[in-house]
Amino acid sequence: QILKRDQVNYVPHLDVEHKDAESLILPSAVAVVGVRGEDIQYRFGYEANRLFHLSYIDEGFCVFYDLKRWVGDADRLEEVVDREGHRSFVPRKEIIRAYLEYVIECARQRFKCSFKSIHISAPVKQKPLFVELFQELLPEYRLESENMLDEGVAVLYNTISTLIKEKQYQDGAIYRALIIDCGAGTTDLSSCRFRITD
């Protein structure tokens, strides 16, 4: 069984630019590979990066990065162009939705299960905006909003999880952390103390 109860479970992604090496990080990149009227075909993550690098050799790929920056202006239209020159205009939120659905589908395939609830971290100052948009984009899921982690705290929890997993902590010792979260045009700085007990 791939899905392990009471543990952090990761979805590895194949980095097609590095001989299909597994990576736990997926680039927030979306490439447009087909435009047929309202029907837009996308590629995501490493495949989008690969197509972006090909576009320097073979013009015609439309690739988007920094999707998180779009949350504040999600209704804005983006022009999409495929390799054959077909064009259309798509709201940014539709591109974001396609990316999120891809990420969820990767997890569904990996763990062979369906999801009813999801948690998406967000920049601390933009949580309400992210919650509102993601609830609109993914109405079929219950989005954790009341206890939604900001991105900096999510990174800290991941670090604590690694300390526990690798037994790299002293039981009961007080640790201090400085969290510097840079992204999407803002930098958040916070500090905390925490203790791990068995």
Regions found by a protein language model. Give the residues of each.
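Gly/Thr-rich phosphate-binding beta-strand-loop-beta motif of the actin/hexokinase/Hsp70
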Residues: Q1-D6, L163-D198
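Phosphate-binding loop and its immediate beta->loop->alpha context
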Residues: D6-A122, K127-E132, L137
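Short regulatory "switch" loops immediately downstream of catalytic or recognition motifs
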Residues: V32-R36, G72-D82, A154-E166, S191-D198
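Short, flexible loop/turn elements at secondary-structure junctions
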Residues: V71, A122-Q126, G152-L156, D181-T186, ...
